[in-house]
Amino acid sequence: MAIYGIDIVALFFFGIHTYIMVYLYKKNHAYCESEPEKVLDMNDPNLPVVTVQLPIFNEFYVVDRLIETTVALKYPKDKLEIQLLDDSTDETVEKSRNLINHYKALGFDIHHLHRAGAARTGHKAGALEAGMKVARGEYIAIFDADFMPDPDFLIKTVPYFEDPQIGMVQVRWGHINADYNVLTKAQSFGIDGHFMIEQVARNGSHLWMNFNGTAGIWKKECILDSGGWEHDTLTEDFDLSYRAEMRGWKFRYFKDIVCKAEIPAMISAYKSQQFRWCKGSIQTAVKLLPRILRADLPWRIKSEAIVHLINYSVHPLMVINILFSAPLLLMDYWSGFSFYDLPIEILMGTAAILSVGSVGPMIFYAYSQKTLHKDWKRRMVYLPVLIMIGTGIAIVNTRAWLEAILGIQSSFKRTPKLKIEKNTDVLKERMKYTVPLDFHVVLEFLMGFYCLGTVFLSFALGKPQIVGFLAIYALGFFYVGYLSLKEAAWKFGASKQGSTEELPAQA
């Protein structure tokens, strides 16, 4: 009973935190709007050298798009260096080499830095570190393979480094395929919530925020002063961000400067991505929280940093909540005790607390859509899907959370990019890279049936008060499990035709 009570209180506080984020957004969002007059003079002979790093690993479908959008950046050729940090193990290497040679012949300062064998260590962080050792830029912009920076990205972001305290500038992620399928529509809600509300709330309130691994630009001095890229976590971006902020560096975030990206259109890719983000953030919490708590910092910064670092703890809390539901129902029935025997004030107060906490995330995501889209009400139809996949990945993320807490190491499994840009693109024809089906799908269906069984138990015992949230959990687990099996069938069919291969882990 005590564990369940603590679990409920913890979930409540995570829910309340979403209200705080919305409040801080409304109060301070103007700080995260760029200044139109702050644009580079392209004729200035004193413009700084900028290095653009493009870390890739087996990106056959999208490497050409990545390079083409990067060479289109508006910046003097003699002040722009491009590094393709290639850890690929397939024909992407040859394709990349040909592309680099083509643009070199056109006068671009572009380099193909391919790591192979024993040199390919440290995942993405290792590649960024290797590239930085030979980079000539004073500033380093980073774009993952699924991103397409606008030509004016550098023109709009570099001017903010006039403030010597600024160590990094991050921009908002946009979407090129948000409307491709139900899954991408739901994911766009989640991404918009983070980038439109959370990042603005933190940066606008002068709280700590994080570089999101891509679509941002660093001052090289800041990276070096903060200890450089380290690869003992799966979220090297989160880790470096907090180490830099502990050193006193300031970050800027702009919600009106957008870098478009491709959203994973397959549930297996989404689950793999969430596993990495969850495990990496908890690894970063284990690594840095002791330092943060000991640091001489205002409590408002410390408290938000704690919540930010452990935010993925909501998923194991969900699992605990589910698993304890049936035993508590039975204990309540066998003991003869009824919650209805409690004073009405306690009953009403408890109901109000639970309702306020659970509604918070829905308000949070709905508000992000309201700030972005005039037709936001029409888009609300996909909010329940976000809630379903958010609960359905609780099994995957609980495993990630436990592995991080227990110090279990795992390989960096990057998210496959399939160049799904238009609604007419056929997903089944882009099966070259796949994430294999794993045992999580079995646990997802088991949890779905457990929730369903607890629903029937609630009715049988005459205690239907928890049926609503159990039904949502059940739908979430069944939906994610169904999508996983559906994709597995596609992959099986593709493998019969020899058009698929499992994506190897990145060393």
Question: Predicted segment positions?
Answer:
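Membrane-embedded multi-pass helical conduit in multi-pass membrane proteins
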Residues: 3-7, 25-27, 35, 39-42, ...
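N-terminal signal-anchor transmembrane helix
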Residues: 20-79
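A short, conserved beta-strand element in the Rossmann-like catalytic core
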Residues: 90-91, 147-149, 174-176, 239, ...
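The conserved acidic donor/metal-binding loop of glycosyltransferases
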Residues: 88, 144-148, 232
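Long helical/loop segments within the catalytic core of UDP-sugar-dependent glycosyltransferases
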Residues: 100-139, 151-234, 245-246, 267-306, ...
